[in-house]
UniProtKB/Swiss-Prot annotation:
Glycans are attached at residue 20. Residues 1-22 are virion surface. A lipid is attached at residue 50 (S-palmitoyl cysteine). The record marks 37 as: Essential for channel activity, possibly by being protonated during channel activation, and by forming the channel gate and the selective filter. The M2 protein from most influenza A strains is inhibited by amantadine and rimantadine, resulting in viral uncoating incapacity. Emergence of amantadine-resistant variants is usually rapid. Cytoplasmic tail plays an important role in virion assembly and morphogenesis. The modification Phosphoserine is found at residue 64. It comes from Influenza A virus (strain A/Wilson-Smith/1933 H1N1). The lineage of its organism: Viruses, Riboviria, Orthornavirae, Negarnaviricota, Polyploviricotina. The chain crosses the membrane at residues 23-43. One of its GO terms (molecular function) is proton transmembrane transporter activity. Forms a proton-selective ion channel that is necessary for the efficient release of the viral genome during virus entry. After attaching to the cell surface, the virion enters the cell by endocytosis. Acidification of the endosome triggers M2 ion channel activity. This is Matrix protein 2. Belongs to the influenza viruses matrix protein M2 family. It is found in: Virion membrane; Host apical cell membrane.
């Protein structure tokens, strides 16, 4: 008899659980792991753009701005932002000359 048929056996015209060993520590641990996995999967699907963009581009440091005038820094920031804003649905690789 498989676990599926054992768990989903009709009891008095209702679907119920016949197994009384649900207080087993292994069952409790498996339930906790399953719930955590579900929560992490939902968060991953909701925020995958932010998460993967941060890992792909956020951990890399940009070029050093030491000794560069503030006006040139601001111009560089605007260029970078415009390049990213072109298509928010896709990542844009920028090669500087």
């Amino acid at each position: 008899m498989s676990l599926l048929t054992e768990v989903e056996t009709p009891i008095r015209n209702e679907w119920g659980c016949r197994c009384n060993d649900s207080s087993d520590p292994l069952v409790i641990a498996a339930n906790i792991i399953g719930i955590l996995h579900l929560i992490l999967w939902i968060l991953d699907r909701l925020f995958f753009k932010c998460i993967y963009r941060r890992f792909k581009y956020g951990l890399k440091r940009g070029p050093s701005t030491e000794g560069v005038p503030e006006s040139m820094r601001e111009e560089y920031r605007k260029e970078q932002q415009n390049a990213v804003d072109v298509d928010d649905g896709h990542f844009v690789n920028i090669e500087l000359e």
